[in-house]
Regions:
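Extracytoplasmic gate region of multi-pass secondary transporters
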Residues: 48-52, 255-311, 367, 371, ...
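Helix-breaking motifs and short loop linkers at transmembrane-helix boundaries and internal kinks
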Residues: 60, 92, 113-118, 289, ...
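Conserved MFS/SLC helix-loop-helix module at the cytosolic interface between two early adjacent transmembrane helices
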Residues: 79-118
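Helix-to-loop junctions at the C-terminal end of transmembrane segments
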Residues: 81-92, 310-322, 410
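Cytoplasmic membrane-interface "Motif A"-like loop-to-helix N-cap segments
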Residues: 90-101, 319-333
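Cytoplasmic helix-loop-helix junction between adjacent transmembrane helices
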Residues: 123-161
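Helix-loop-helix hairpin linking two adjacent transmembrane segments in secondary transporters
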Residues: 158-212
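C-terminal transmembrane helical hairpin of 12-TM major facilitator-type secondary transporters
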Residues: 323-370
Length: 463
């Protein structure tokens, strides 16, 4: 099984006259494969949420038990993102991603035939563990095929797969219910999404690509000279082929202050995001006295406003900010701070909805920019490990702070305590955005010095 996940031998070299055309076609296929793959992971993750009313009614599970199941998946997913993303550095991205999808589908089929709570809990944990196999290959693929100047737009396109995947789960499950009927709720909730995921897994295998070299093409550094210096590291004397995934993680990520800075950016972004999304329904219903329909509209705006904002932010970070990601993240977090106060203090139904939509519009931008920054602070062969650290930190600490600690603050101090917590998280996020930006500028300066030194040596050799 493990041997199937390993990178295969390099393909025959593409003839020189076909390199440009092949390169352009392959990288579009690679991007589409990880977009579809990530989208499919959401189909076999978010379907669980849609099944919870039937779990409560048909299997007589309590709200506490359902909450425990959700927490199990969240924790397992956070741990898995850390471990699986590191392992992905040594694997074939398309095989790794497709394998994870198939395993998630198998688990969902198991959920469709389960009736005992503890069996459900075990399968939900397994689903969370296999879900972690989707993120690492996505970032590795983008880092392998797209230069720094394009990663903002490319990362933005890939990032909306989260929103699209989350958005099409309900129509898929709803159509299954319409065809099969509520008496077959387990098939509609679990088995149909599992079948859809398998179809997407096949598309990942067909469209997906390894690194350019594995596909018989020159590397990104050879195709685009400006990338050559970007990938240099002070540890470059040891070939990564001779290092295990753990050694790569320790050498290029664990000791890398910039990897920690960007991970803490994600921690506090997730804290604010989960604090808003987890508590928005109950806050609007009980404090702002929204109707269920009005709350649903506000929730819809919070989620879907992120798509145009993310695409615009990708273009701005590439073009206006010249590949520097954190200044835009700082601007977004500052605006979120202001809108959070408006969301909290406003009594107008319209204004509360508007402020919620703006927060939803902006909160995914720093998250996606942090993911792009991650690809630029480590060499391409360590991207999975860096993504793993970010994923572990964001889910285990960030999501927990936004859900559990927010609830504790509300119980102890009232709703204002929860909002003070989120405001503090925003301030901390801005601080780590600044530190991450400063670290990126230092790397940029080091790259320029290295480039100048190489040019000087080349000139000396020529003379």
């Amino acid at each position: 099984m493990l041997s199937l996940l390993k990178k295969g031998p390099s393909a025959n070299k593409v003839p020189a006259e076909k390199i440009q055309a092949t390169y352009g076609r392959y990288r579009m296929q690679a991007l589409l494969s990880v977009f579809l793959g990530c989208l499919a992971y959401y189909i076999v993750r978010n379907n669980f949420t849609l099944s919870t009313p039937y779990l409560k009614e048909q299997l007589d599970l309590s709200a506490t038990q359902i909450g425990l199941l959700s927490s199990c998946m969240l924790i397992a997913y956070g741990i898995s993102k850390g471990v699986m993303s590191s392992l992905a550095d040594k694997a074939s991205p398309k095989v790794f991603m497709a394998c994870g999808l198939v395993l998630c589908a198998i688990v969902n089929v198991g959920l469709g035939f389960s009736t005992a709570f503890w069996v459900f809990a075990a399968l939900v944990v397994l689903n969370g563990l296999f879900q972690g196999m989707g993120v690492g290959p996505s970032f590795i693929t983008i880092a392998n095929w797209f230069p720094r100047r394009e990663r903002g737009r490319v990362g933005a396109f890939w990032n909306i797969s989260h929103n699209v995947g989350g958005g099409i789960v309900a129509p898929i499950v709803g159509a299954a219910f319409a065809i099969l009927g509520t008496e077959h709720w387990q098939s509609a909730s679990y088995i149909v999404p599992a079948c859809v995921a398998v179809v997407f897994a096949i598309s990942v295998l067909v469209l997906g690509k390894g690194s350019p070299r594995e596909e018989g093409l020159p590397s990104l550094a050879e195709m685009m000279p400006e990338e050559k210096v970007v990938l240099k590291t002070k540890h470059g004397q040891k070939a990564p082929e001779n290092m295990s995934a753990f050694q790569i993680f320790c050498t290029y990520v664990l000791r890398n202050k910039n990897a920690w800075y960007v991970s803490f950016v994600d921690v506090f972004v997730y804290m604010v995001r989960f604090g808003m999304i987890s508590w928005l329904p109950i806050y609007l219903l009980t404090v702002k006295h929204f109707s269920k329909e009005q709350m649903s509209v506000a929730f819809l705006f919070f989620e879907w406003a992120a798509i145009p904002a993310t695409l615009l932010a990708g273009w701005l970070s590439d073009k206006l900010f010249k590949g520097r990601r954190m200044p835009l993240a700082i601007i977004c977090m500052t605006l979120i701070f202001i809108c959070l106060i408006g969301y909290w203090k406003s009594e107008s139904l319209l204004m509360v909805t508007v402020f919620a939509a703006i927060v939803g519009c902006l909160i995914y931008v720093p998250q996606f920019l942090a993911s792009v920054q991650t690809m630029e602070i480590v060499p391409s062969f360590a991207v999975g490990s860096a993504v793993g650290l970010r994923g572990f930190m964001s889910y285990i600490f960030g999501a927990s702070l936004g859900t559990s600690l927010f609830g504790v603050m509300v119980d102890k101090m009232g709703w204002h305590g929860g909002f003070y917590l989120l405001m503090g998280g925003i301030v901390c996020c801005i601080l780590f955005c600044y530190l991450s930006h400063r670290g990126a500028l230092e790397l940029e300066q080091q790259r320029k010095i290295t480039e100048q030194e190489e040019a000087r040596l080349a000139l000396a050799d020529a003379q």
